[in-house]
Amino acid sequence: MSARRLPALVVAWVLAAAATAAAGDRFAVVITGASGGEVYAKKYTQVRTSFTATLRDTFGYKVDHLFVLAEQEEKNVQKATRENVQRVFVDLRKRMTKDDQLLVFLAGHGTLTDGSGEDAKFNLVGPDLSASEWADLLKVIPGRLVFVDTTGGSFPFLHKMAARGRVVLTATDSSAQQFETVFPEYFVRAFDDDAADTDKSGRVSIWEAFQYASAAVQQWFEQKGELPTERPLLDDTGAGVGREAQAPGVDGAIARVTYLEPEPALELPSDAALAGLVRRRAALEAALEELKARKESLSPDQYATELEAILTELARVSLQIKAKS
């Protein structure tokens, strides 16, 4: 794919993400796998319970839209087995639509499947699922996907899970990085810390959570006087390459307009077609503000291309609203 063509595709994906963001439901699958010991079990339990509380109590995820799996079965928590994971995604395939959003969050241990470093497993209770198998499970799920693998063996998941319009995060940028990670704690914390809301919009986007957690990981290693053994990556172009939070790159445009919490409520007209146009205009206006916020990180040509695309579509939608009003 040419460098010239890539920005145009990114613009299209951002517009699509922005346009559908307010329309659908939100689902989440939060999994902490086999712990391998009491210390790890305590850590993973804390991450899981904190994150599910945020999704449920702060963001308002419905009980039947939030699937939680862990090493030990308990109330509203299934055992994290291969069979239960597969069953969850069979259910989601039936229930979700193209306008819905799904978050998949993995915390625990990850291991490489062989010496090539091309594939890895997320450790479950009993038989595991490899990155390739996760990709097969999720490719039939409709809607938008945010996939976050916070394990030490997460890097191979980046290129296995990457696809057009998806947002994929991993805790590591190399198959050689297989140590226990601190990324999950900081990623979860981002959604409860006003400091993560760098654009002061009142909400934390996936990109802002990624930036927040990446900076916290770096600071954690600096304070310990150690070289980092994890460097988080984010991919949302589908290229499967990704970028670090402070590195240049095209990735991040969709993540900047992707949120876990529902979109703010709009006062919508009773006419369904007109209501859809009002939603799209609001989403485009949000995308425009996001683009302005990252102007300094873009080349003049790329900024102009994205700005023209958004303004052109915004003008078209505004004319349609005027004609129907």
Regions found by a protein language model. Give the residues of each.
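Alpha-helical, heptad-rich or low-complexity scaffold/stalk segments
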Residues: 150, 270-323
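Boundary/activation segment at the start of structured domains
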Residues: 19-106, 110-121, 135, 253-264, ...
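Solvent-exposed loop/turn segments at secondary-structure junctions
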Residues: 34-38, 72-76, 108-114, 127-130, ...
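Extracytoplasmic/secreted proteins, especially bacterial periplasmic and envelope-associated proteins
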Residues: 39-50, 54, 80, 84-91, ...
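Bacterial N-terminal signal peptides
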Residues: 7-18
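Caspase-like cysteine protease fold
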Residues: 197-281
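Active-site-proximal C-terminal subdomain of hydrolase catalytic domains
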Residues: 49, 145-236
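Second-shell loop/turn segments in exported
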Residues: 34-42, 71-79, 119-125, 171-177, ...
